[in-house]
Amino acid sequence: MKGVLSMNTNMQEINEPAFHAYLKKAQASPNTIRSCLVAYRLYHSLYNDLAVNHLLCFKDYLIRHYKASTVNNRIYGINRYLDFLEEIYGSQMIHFRLTVIRTQQAAFLDNIISQEDYETFKKRLKDSGNMLWYFVVRFLACTGARVSELIQIKAEHLHLGYIDLYTKGGKVRRLHFPDALCQEALEWLSAKGQVSGFLFVNRRGNQITARGISSQLKTLAIRCNIPPETV
């Protein structure tokens, strides 16, 4: 299957020294090599094959367990691993790379909302039935989206598993969503009878503005006893 490269245990053992040699040949520093191998080992401790969905879940795992700077280091490492595999296997690999956490997302996760506060924020929103804002928090944390990009997500994009975002320079940036998050969000939409259109709308059904998202996040953080400056 294109986009999936099965990796059994023996193959992993073969690939680690080969990956190490690839990094040395590229004149990576000892610290960079060490960091890349940590990312490699962590990924394969969680998943037995390489698939886009597993890579996205890996990013979600990193976000839930590490600070933003560490998340980006691990993403860099796994992307170098994908470079290495693409060089070896060519057409058997699709050209997919994880996006790093952007400045705004890093601020949301690490400036300085603790992992404990992040988990508390999600849980309090979900337990109180405030699902719209629960999903705002989830999509911000699980993707590389800016708030201005977040508000463009529609139900149709959840069925696709991604959204194509057009930059000022005319380039397209594809933002992927983890399957589990798509499924959970689609169940939420189905429960309220929505089959299409923007995910994040106000009571009148209008798209919430980026400023509205940022402002309300701070208000909700205060209610959840979370420092508003961290969101």
Named regions from a protein language model:
Residues 36, 118, 132-134, 210, ...:
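Short, leucine-enriched amphipathic alpha-helices that occur as contiguous helical runs
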Residues 104-120, 170-181, 193-196:
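DNA breakage-rejoining catalytic core of tyrosine-based enzymes
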Residues 178-229:
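Active-site/catalytic core of tyrosine-dependent DNA strand-transfer enzymes
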Residues 143, 152-187:
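Conserved tyrosine-mediated DNA breakage-rejoining catalytic core shared by Y-recombinases
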Residues 149-150, 229-231:
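Active-site-proximal segment of tyrosine recombinases
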Residues 2-4, 16-109:
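N-terminal core-binding DNA-recognition domain of tyrosine recombinases/integrases
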Residues 115-147, 171:
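Basic, Lys/Arg- and aromatic-enriched nucleic-acid-binding interface segment
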